[in-house]
Amino acid sequence: MAKIKKGDLVQVITGAKAERGGDRGKQGKVLRVFPDTNRVLVEGINRVTKHTKVGQSQRGTKTGGIEVVEASIHISNVALVDPSTKKPTRVGFRTETVERNGKKREVRVRVAKSSGKDI
């Protein structure tokens, strides 16, 4: 089970400070997780300018130009935000026994290390 999933609120914990033009300390929602490269795409974080070549789309409209998009960031540079305290926290796991249709199953639940509450 992954510690960070799509839709989680994370905070950047490394890099340049926000007052110096960096993203450290900023919080954002995870848009996509790339498990093969250990990277995440976070909303509003690591924005870069992308220069695309001018061409034509199938509708005949001109495409291309300069656009600002989010680039991925390594998963070790972000920390999950505890929903109760709104501060970054480490993630742990706890197993719970759940009974469905008369069958017992063990389910792993993500837990915030700082507060001990479920995420």
From Swiss-Prot:
Which Pfam families does the record cross-reference, listed alphabetically? KOW, ribosomal_L24
Keyword rRNA-binding assigned to the entry: answer is yes
Listed A to Z, the keywords are:
Ribonucleoprotein, Ribosomal protein, RNA-binding, rRNA-binding
What biological processes does GO assign it?
translation
Question: What CDD domains does the record tag this protein with?
Answer: KOW_RPL26
NCBIfam families for the chain: rplX_bact (TIGR01079)
**Protein name (database record):** Large ribosomal subunit protein uL24
Organism lineage string: Bacteria, Bacillati, Actinomycetota, Actinomycetes, Micrococcales
